[in-house]
UniProtKB/Swiss-Prot annotation:
<comment type="similarity">
    <text>Belongs to the AccD/PCCB family.</text>
</comment>
<comment type="subunit">
    <text>Acetyl-CoA carboxylase is a heterohexamer composed of biotin carboxyl carrier protein, biotin carboxylase and 2 subunits each of ACCase subunit alpha and ACCase plastid-coded subunit beta (accD).</text>
</comment>
<dbReference type="GO" id="GO:0016743">
    <property type="term" value="F:carboxyl- or carbamoyltransferase activity"/>
</dbReference>
<dbReference type="InterPro" id="IPR000438">
    <property type="entry name" value="Acetyl_CoA_COase_Trfase_b_su"/>
</dbReference>
<keyword id="KW-0934">Plastid</keyword>
<keyword id="KW-0444">Lipid biosynthesis</keyword>
<dbReference type="GO" id="GO:0003989">
    <property type="term" value="F:acetyl-CoA carboxylase activity"/>
</dbReference>
<dbReference type="GO" id="GO:0008270">
    <property type="term" value="F:zinc ion binding"/>
</dbReference>
<dbReference type="GO" id="GO:2001295">
    <property type="term" value="P:malonyl-CoA biosynthetic process"/>
</dbReference>
<keyword id="KW-0067">ATP-binding</keyword>
<keyword id="KW-0443">Lipid metabolism</keyword>
<keyword id="KW-0808">Transferase</keyword>
<feature type="binding site">
    <location>
        <position position="227"/>
    </location>
    <ligand>
        <name>Zn(2+)</name>
    </ligand>
</feature>
<keyword id="KW-0863">Zinc-finger</keyword>
<feature type="binding site">
    <location>
        <position position="230"/>
    </location>
    <ligand>
        <name>Zn(2+)</name>
    </ligand>
</feature>
<keyword id="KW-0276">Fatty acid metabolism</keyword>
<keyword id="KW-0862">Zinc</keyword>
Amino acid sequence: MEKSWFNLMFSKGELESRGELSKAMDSFAPSEKTTISQDRFIYDMDKNFYGWGERSSYSNNVDLLVSSKDIRNFISDDTFFVRDSNKNSYSIYFDIKKKFFEIDNDFSDLEIFFYNYCSSSYLNNRSKGDNDLHYDPYIKDTKYNCTNHINSCIDSYFRSHICIDSNFLSNSKNSNESYIYNFICSESGKIRESKNYKIRTNRNRSNLISSKDFDITQNYNQLWIQCDNCYGLMYKKVKMNVCEQCGHYLKMSSSERIELSIDPGTWNPMDEDMVSADPIKFHSKEEPYKNRIDSAQKTTGLTDAVQTGTGQLNGIPVALGVMDFQFMGGSMGSVVGEKITRLIEYATNQCLPLILVCSSGGARMQEGSLSLMQMAKISSVLCDYQSSKKLFYISILTSPTTGGVTASFGMLGDIIIAEPYAYIAFAGKRVIEQTLKKAVPDGSQAAESLLRKGLLDAIVPRNLLKGVLRELFQLHAFFPLNKN
């Protein structure tokens, strides 16, 4: 029987780990003198000693002691000596082949906890849909399974004896990584001296006290965003919600688009107090229309699915309307139609260039024919703006732009610009396939396909959009108020 030392200190004050892990991950030595030689411990490490973070689902930036595929090389007959905060040492012995697990009598409650865990329905009756943090996709592999449950047992035992603030890991994508490993290993894989982390036991019924570093992370986590295509993290204020790893364009709120396009301090919103009054008393078994409106208003901070107003773009006065897909899918109801109509009429009277940023699923079904009439109403005032006054209208199509918006003002711009990879269509792919019983080719409703067919004038990346708009306005004799 070969024995290994693993010094892990849990105190009421600081969480300490006394050991260092080299960059090559080939040595691990205890800080105190023990009866086991350092060479023996290195020998055990060379046999792929497995760390606490075995079930991490997001370990691309974390160097584990051994990867999941090497778990089969785990020592099948091994004893670990563990010391707690009270300087009490006890042994953990297990045999993977025989599924045998034994704890020193000084900590017999851990042994009872393990056997209760293994005898429960978790071992044999779990499925992937149970949302179980300990679900093992290799449940049929005995060695892998047994090792998983040994680690789960030890992990769960310490969880039950240490109070953790649930908000501490709420914003982390690694929340299902082993709890102990999260607090010991940093992203570089080295053991870190966690002088700022304070843990109190259940005796005082207190929560985890996080460090100042984590307070800062909580305060500024809105500055970071995760790509829904490759799951990479990016600083969204710099990258404009465009993934720097895969180039995927993420959705932007209307406020973010206004901030991107309009000069700071020049935005003047219009008709902010206009709200829908449920004109046809729409009845829904799932959720009343007014409740959905209230919920969307609380979520987005907007009164409806569009923001309208005036501002300056590189010093050039413009009228701007920006739709927000987060508000009921950017659907166009009577309020959206009225706000856009008033914006166009104001731009007509003031002889301002007009920009409408479209992001919508189409007409709002909860308002029936009133929502459909907004298509004709907006198109009518646009006709006067473009034909009678000879003013300049730019339509910007973002993903997704579909339905009634595409069939009306979305495609009426003097210049029609789309974002890269934007989904633009009148009827969605699913609707077409169900109606015509024909498959819709992939990419046929993407901006690049529409550009090749002549339905768009240009596809402009976000970082170049403001400069392109400035040049278009100057080409049509719209210049900054103050030339510097």
